[in-house]
Structures are given as C-alpha cells and as structure tokens.
C-alpha cells in the first residue's frame, strides 16, 4: 500500500489536533474522524476535499492587493494547515514563489517584528548558547532531515536584518517541500541570534531580537561550534544549509564544517550551480562552449567568487588547464578589477586575481581597471552581476561589451529586484535585442520591436530542492563539488532554448518537481561513486526518490493514546 494511503495513528484530539499544523485538515476531517477525535461541533458541518479548500484559499489570497499582505496570508495558512499550504503553493507555483520567497520575503524580513503572528522554527540566541541541546529537544519535529540556518547578517541584498532574517530559512524550506518533495515534518528553520549592527532595529521598540551589537569573532566562532556540535548529536545525518551569512563568515564556516557534517552554503554553492547550469544552457543555445568564452563579474564577494570557481571547474572539465581557465575570468569589485598587488583581498579572492602582465596592454586611467575598461580590455562574452548594487550595468558598460560580442550573455543576478544591476528592459534596449539574459529576481517578459523576450530567473530553487531530495533519498553523507557540477549539467539539459523547444532559457516552474527528481538521481549516482551514499541500482534509487517525495495529500487518521 502506498504510504499516502496508509492511516496515521494520532494521539491528539479536539482543539489540540486543530492547532497542530502538520496534522490539521480543517473542514476535510471526515465524519468518522470528527467523532473519533472529539471534533464534532468544532468545525462547520460540510465535509470538503483539499481541492475545495485550496480553491477557497486562492480566492481569499486573490483579494489582497499587496504582495506583503499576500505573504502574510500564506504564512497564516502555513501555520494553520501545512498540507493545504503546500497544495495551494504547488497548484500556483509560478504565482506564489515570488510571494513566499524572493523578492517579497525581503520585505517580510525587514518587517518581521511588525508582522509577526506566531512562532515557527527555533530561535537560538547567544545568551542561551549552553542550552542548545535542550532547545533542539524542544523542537516539535523529531525526525529532522533538512535544516536551514542563518544569523541574519546578509539577508539578500538588504544587509543586516537581525532576527528578521528568520524569514529566509522559513521561505527556503517552503521551497524544499514545494519543489523538492521534502516532507514538512522533516524540515527545521533555525535563527542564530547573535545581535545586530543595524541601529534602526536596535532603536525599534517592536524589534524582537537580542538588543545588542553583534558579538565579537571569537565568541561567534565558539557559538557556531556549540550549535553544530549539538545538531550532530541530535540529528547526525541531517543536511545543514547555511543561508545568508556575511562574507567574513560564509566561506570560513563552509570550509570548517564541510567535512564534519553534511552541509552546504546555498549562497556560494547553490548560486554557483544554478548560474553555471544556466550559462551552459545559454552557451549551447548559441553553439559554443563555456571554455571558449571570457567571463566578467561585478561583485567579488563569496557568492561571486563561488560562481567563478565553479565556472573554472567547468572550463577544466571541458579541457582547459587551470591557469588558462583562470585567465578567462575577470572579477571586478568596488575598487576595480582584482589584480596582483591589490590590498586587503581575502584568500578566496586572491585565487581570482589577474596578473599585471595579462593587462599590461590595456588602456587603464586609474590604479585599477574600471568595469568599462574591463569591457574593452578583456572583451568578455559573459557579464554576471552579484554586487547587490542597483544600476552598475550602465548603458556605457553594456554598449562597450556589445561592441565586441554579437550575442552577449548578461546575468544581473542581485536580489531583490530593486538591487538589480540593470533591468531586463534596459539590457534588451541597449543591445538591440541581441542578448541572452537571466536575472536573480522574477521579471515579466519584455516586448521589444514586436518580439517577446521571456526573462529566465536564475533561481537557486532549480538546484537546492534536488540536493535535499538526494541527501534524504540516498543517505548522502557529504556534499561535494562533483555533485553540484552534475546538478548544473542536469539543469542545462532541461533548457527549452538549448533544446530548440522554445525561447525559454530555463524550464518552467511547472516542471520543477520532475527536475528536482532528475537532479536528485544524478547527484546520488555521483555520491555513490565517491563512496558517500547508499549502493543502489537505478531502479532502487528511483524508487527511493519517489518514496521520499512528499505530496500534499490528506491521510486517514486513526486514534491512539499517548
């Protein structure tokens, strides 16, 4: 009997059952269940299916005029009836993904203390650092398989949001379930509250987080060690995703813990994987290889450098040597092109500097090459923005790029949409429509000279749900670069544009559940070859993936005593 058809034995009854979001069915409780669970009279008399409930919920949702109010409404359903919430989201994924995650989740993080209704997940403050084991035991979910954790310091392109950063793990895990089939019973959002340096929040009487500046680095490192160790004791096989940690901590945390626990940083590795997958699709659509092209970045933080390193790995997979691959990648930060001799660079940036000899023939006015000078000197075929600064891709920059590249690939990826380096409309106009474009935030299609340009959203949700599904289905113990590379390849293989099926660079969101299955399968195969997963035949692996792919369906309940 399929798991969804097996009855669940439930110890709760009456209001306690209705107040348990993972179990509440609302008006869908049958007559027999209402009698068995002391629900008679607590609900309207009509029995409804989940489809009828979802139709009513969508009508209510549609009455809200602003995205933030739609977000608040969906969170209310999430906190009341998780099965209905995910049914509603899956039925309307393209409409609701920008509401439950980027860009609207950015507004929700900024307004967290103002719109707070009820608790979800764990809030672990530095002051409680010696009680973390007890706090993890307080979690209402015993079989946690995926944790998303943040410290709220670098939320999207919005900076330090303190405790408001909790909106990101909640939203991210919603997509693990909606897109990757991870059961909501197995997910846990965690906020590590180490204070905030956002004075506006500290001065806000409604702010719900710890009212002090962020703790010093030694205290921070001690706190993270206590947290990771406690998680390993409680759930030794969990997948831990680091989310929206600031640059000074993001890469060091990943390097410190990647061999101690199954973990990854979505801002670094997930962003890199989806970007490389989208680039591969773009390259194939124009009949070229990534290794044949030059790439320029605006933004040399942990995310940008993470993408660059995966691009270099892909170029090497295509036959280039490491030195040649690195010579084709140009990183621009706020001071200019990363170059030998530039001061105050982090270790991960040092590996991506250009030699002084390589740019000796360039026409450079200042100490370091500007973005426009990089366009003329490097002649990049690809331009990627991960700066978090709006407007950096000016008309002068784009026209300089277009002067040497017939069909440039331009990805302004910064989130939220108000932080984007250039809008799709601007890029299309400045290139006379001769461009392949993808963005980090959702944008409507652009009409230009009688042609419609669909705008691909280079969204990490194409990748991380499949990573989670692979870990859960195949008991993967570590995440490796090879797994993320095969995820990129799987995404590229699904590109309608590269396959000549349509003008869409990335597959539609309606197919993301199947894409997550395909990515999970590919990752699990690599994991087994690397000795990091179960040994399974292809048929066994497919069955495992399907068995673990949760669907928002009500199950029959039977009562048991506590």
UniProtKB/Swiss-Prot annotation:
Cofactors required: Mg(2+); Mn(2+)
Q: Which domain of life is it from?
A: Bacteria
This protein's assembly is summarised as: Homotetramer.
Q: Which Pfam families match?
A: malic, Malic_M
GO MF term list: malate dehydrogenase (decarboxylating) (NAD+) activity; metal ion binding; NAD binding; oxaloacetate decarboxylase activity
- Provide the taxonomic classification: Bacteria, Pseudomonadati, Pseudomonadota, Gammaproteobacteria, Alteromonadales
Residues annotated as catalytic: 101 (proton donor), 172 (proton acceptor)
> Which residues does the annotation list for site: Important for activity?
267
GO cellular component assignments: cytosol
Q: What is this protein called?
A: NAD-dependent malic enzyme
Q: Which UniProt keywords apply?
A: Metal-binding, NAD, Oxidoreductase
Enumerate the residues binding a divalent metal cation.
Answer: 243-244, 267
Q: How is the cofactor bound?
A: Divalent metal cations. Prefers magnesium or manganese.
State the Gene Ontology BP annotations: malate metabolic process
Q: Which reaction does it catalyse?
A: (S)-malate + NAD(+) = pyruvate + CO2 + NADH; oxaloacetate + H(+) = pyruvate + CO2
**If you read the UniProt record, what top EC class would you report for this enzyme, in one word?**
oxidoreductase
Residues involved in NAD(+) binding: 154, 267, 415
Q: What is its EC number?
A: 1.1.1.38
Describe the family membership recorded for this protein in Swiss-Prot or TrEMBL. Belongs to the malic enzymes family.
